[in-house]
Amino acid sequence: MSSLTRLTLAQVAQKLKAREVSAVEVLDACLTQVRSTEKQISAYVCVLEDQARAAAHATDADIRGRWKGPLHGVPVAVKDLYDIAGVPTTASSPAHELDAQQDPARVRRLQDAGAVILGKTHTHEFAYGRITPKSRNPRDPGRTPGGSSGGSAATVAACCVYLATGTDTGGSVRIPSSMCNTVGLKQPTVGRVHGAGVSSLSWSLDHPGPITRTVEDTALMLQVMAGFDPADPRSLDEPVPSYAEGLGQGVKGLRWGVPKNYFFDRVDPEVESAVRAAIDQLKELGAELVEVEVPMAEQIIPVKFGIMLPEASAYHRTMLRESPELYTADVRILLELGDLVTATDYLQAQRVRTLMQRAVAEMYQRIDVLIAPTLPIPAARSGEEVHTWPDGTVEALVMAYTRFTSFGNVTGLPTLNLPCGFSKDGLRSACRSGRPLDEKTLLRAGLAYEKATTWHQRHPELIGAG
């Protein structure tokens, strides 16, 4: 592996700005890493080498005249739900192939910032799953990278790119980030990052978000992605703050909520141990810990499915009726199930969601950040569909993996996955959820913990082996 690809986004940006390396050299290093690892992890639907090389050459000319910022000349991967003009959007499914006529705002913002789009990454079909079966985990190719943004997390963890885009409807940025040891931010507050130009799973719950290797890099990418888009009816017309400003202020003065209920129920002992150790370390750093009861927690999963199932089925209604054989069985079953949800049940789920959001907002009057496990269990082996607990209880992986992450989607709060340890059979990551429109505090909290640890610096041993 090239030492260049091991750098963070912030580090390679400084080298590009100082013209110590060229955008073409950075791209070549990333493409070499892709060729070295792709047979192992299968992260990409397509690698846009010719386009990327042309963009890198143009970028080098631009940098000589005007540096556009930390993404200028940096290779980025895009989840194959995002449109790119002239490139098919397949959503990793034979049922869906669209050629976009123009770049949506979120891709255009990356390009305007000088980013070089290297390729499009695999997703679980239509983002409707949590394992991304076509991709593998760079830390153990025998295990799932998680989903649905599994290709994006895998290629970032494998040091093929410095950043990638994802989407998150029930955990699809944070689940693969947890399994691959990357930093993943579920779209900040709903509407903070524009959503037009992406294949939808559930309009009410979909959140875009960045995947990187450090909190600082996440802040840099968010700065570019955030902003108002008139093409997106959910987009927030609110000023975008400077996410880098005050990022290194530490945890002193921040109130960290530690949940007494739900988030530590039925959790792998090693997961709980790692997250509790992270909480203890935060206390040593000066954080104020506040025990909280998460309100209406038992409604998180029913509300998520009560909204997601019918919305996904509505989006796919025509394609499912015309070509059901083109869908994989697991996705087709969920889409057929969504047709059985009544309008009454759907509206009730939306009503309960509103009540939950109000109750959680009251909880956040006492705290600034909530810390809890991202996942209750480690990454499963490829092909596994259930997890068996020590008492013999069997839990479907799709339920286990979204049990905690769905909280962020139902409430609409910004939520960050942050690496917090390893174990003999998988990764352990903690998540932090912040208040609406307060991504800055969430990132500040994450960076303080990251600086006190080295989990984010550990690259996969297998990468580059052949």
From Swiss-Prot:
EC number(s) stated in the UniProt entry for this protein = 3.5.1.4
InterPro entries named in the record: Amidase, Amidase_CS, Amidase_dom, AS_sf
Which residue positions does the secretion signal occupy? none
Query: Which key words are in the record?
Result: Hydrolase
Query: Looking at the record's lineage, which domain of life comes first?
Result: Bacteria
Region annotation Disordered: where it falls in the sequence: 128-152
Q: Does the keyword Amino-acid biosynthesis apply?
A: no
Check the record and name the Pfam families matching this protein: Amidase (PF01425)
Question: Mind listing the GO molecular function terms for this protein?
Answer: amidase activity
Which principal EC class is assigned to this enzyme?
hydrolase
The answer to whether the entry has keyword Hydrolase is yes
- Residues at the active site: 79 (charge relay system), 148 (charge relay system), 172 (acyl-ester intermediate)
The reaction(s) catalysed by this protein are: a monocarboxylic acid amide + H2O = a monocarboxylate + NH4(+)
Its family remark reads:
Belongs to the amidase family.
What protein am I looking at? Answer: Amidase
Q: Which organism is it from?
A: Pseudomonas putida
